[in-house]
């Protein structure tokens, strides 16, 4: 079975984890709410007006 020849340093470990974190941050895209015009996450109710697909689902 394959095993690492050298121990992974803290710096290398943290660099690997940081790449995954920043890739996740960049993956968020925002769309304009058709009801109020504010930016909101897609496929979710708008946190500013509470509408989703022309229906009010949250009381704001």
Swiss-Prot record:
<dbReference type="InterPro" id="IPR002677">
    <property type="entry name" value="Ribosomal_bL32"/>
</dbReference>
<dbReference type="GO" id="GO:0015934">
    <property type="term" value="C:large ribosomal subunit"/>
</dbReference>
<dbReference type="InterPro" id="IPR044957">
    <property type="entry name" value="Ribosomal_bL32_bact"/>
</dbReference>
<protein>
    <recommendedName>
        <fullName>Large ribosomal subunit protein bL32</fullName>
    </recommendedName>
</protein>
<dbReference type="GO" id="GO:0003735">
    <property type="term" value="F:structural constituent of ribosome"/>
</dbReference>
<keyword id="KW-0689">Ribosomal protein</keyword>
<dbReference type="InterPro" id="IPR011332">
    <property type="entry name" value="Ribosomal_zn-bd"/>
</dbReference>
<dbReference type="Pfam" id="PF01783">
    <property type="entry name" value="Ribosomal_L32p"/>
</dbReference>
<comment type="similarity">
    <text>Belongs to the bacterial ribosomal protein bL32 family.</text>
</comment>
<keyword id="KW-0687">Ribonucleoprotein</keyword>
<dbReference type="GO" id="GO:0006412">
    <property type="term" value="P:translation"/>
</dbReference>
